[in-house]
């Protein structure tokens, strides 16, 4: 355990400087986390929530997250790892449509940013941060809690809590978002998992299993296809190849928020489940990562609070392709 932690804690320094970090572990899972920091954090872009960035995670010799990209820059929109989240309102930041050039709008989990004179929101760009808010990090041996407070920004303000905890074979992400401003917070939020099961390339050994029969809305160009409830790859993706589509077929029940990603070559599996209905799924993958992006919707009136939970249960793939997996108790605790 001590040897492993020493290796994990050295990982953030690979970015070239001292990066704030932490480690959590239980008897089965070991994970390294990057911590939010406006001056020296590993990720300082404005697309994704800064909390809960998982630098690496190991379960019974299998690895699940890591650096999937070739070029690192702390302000790149996607220079990030692990199951991270993005909040969107009308496919933009909160308050973006109301703000005039030179005024502020909100990126939840990032802070208040400046709106330039532009025709439309540039999701993959990095905006100037004018108020990063206040971050507090609380820690235990098998959990870390992030608290982000943002004061009034054009009528929007919040206290956002996100706790990562390990229970048995499961990483649980618990969220609470309290609206402390004058305006309603209406947003969607999705998990961008950046799965890297055992660092293997995306190809026929990888299968993504849904709780429903998925329908791809875009052409998969001979690279992948749906078979029943499975999304499968027909060939190993080359470095410049991408599979991207929206997925339809889910219903209005949280039961459909149940997605498994498996590598049949190495035996690594992960089951992602949520306690809210899915509102949208975007599927994106390249050679180095597989990302089924499940969205949920939030609407929080002033003075009110909303909570939601995502669980990642890690398991060994059995020989039977449809072997049953009992949902971890961590999902219900």
Where in the sequence are the language-model features?
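Surface-exposed acidic/polar loop and edge beta-strand patches at domain peripheries
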Residues: 18-172, 180-186, 192-333
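Sec-dependent N-terminal signal peptides
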Residues: 3-12
């Amino acid at each position: 355990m001590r040897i492993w932690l020493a290796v994990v804690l050295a990982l953030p320094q690979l970015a070239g400087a001292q990066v704030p970090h932490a480690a959590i572990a239980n008897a089965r899972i070991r994970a390294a986390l990057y911590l939010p920091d406006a001056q020296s954090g590993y990720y300082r872009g404005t697309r994704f929530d800064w909390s809960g960035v998982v630098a690496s995670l190991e379960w019974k010799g299998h690895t699940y997250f890591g650096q999937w990209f070739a070029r690192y820059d702390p302000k790149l929109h996607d220079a990030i790892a692990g199951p991270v989240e993005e909040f969107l309102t009308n496919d933009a930041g909160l308050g973006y449509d109301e703000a005039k050039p030179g005024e502020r709008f909100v990126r939840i989990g990032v802070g208040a940013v400046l709106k330039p004179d532009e025709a439309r929101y540039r999701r993959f760009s990095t905006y100037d941060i004018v108020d990063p808010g206040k971050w507090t990090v609380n820690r235990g041996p098998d959990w870390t809690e992030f608290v982000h407070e943002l004061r009034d920004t054009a009528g929007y303000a919040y206290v956002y809590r996100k706790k990562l905890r390990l229970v048995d074979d499961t990483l649980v992400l618990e969220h609470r978002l309290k609206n402390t401003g004058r305006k309603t917070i209406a947003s969607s939020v999705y998990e961008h998992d950046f799965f890297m099961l055992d660092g293997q390339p995306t190809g026929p050994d990888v299968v993504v299993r849904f709780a429903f029969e998925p329908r791809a809305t875009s052409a998969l160009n001979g690279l992948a296809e749906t078979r029943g409830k499975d999304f499968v790859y027909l060939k190993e993706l080359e470095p410049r190849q991408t599979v991207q589509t929206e997925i339809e077929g889910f219903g209005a029940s949280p039961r459909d928020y149940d997605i498994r990603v498996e590598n049949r070559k190495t035996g690594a599996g992960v089951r992602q489940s949520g306690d809210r209905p899915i509102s949208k799924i975007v599927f994106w993958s390249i050679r180095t990562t597989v990302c089924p992006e499940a969205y949920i919707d939030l609407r929080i009136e002033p003075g009110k609070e909303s909570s939601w939970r995502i669980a990642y249960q890690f398991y060994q793939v059995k020989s039977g392709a449809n072997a049953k997996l009992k949902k971890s108790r961590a999902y219900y605790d």
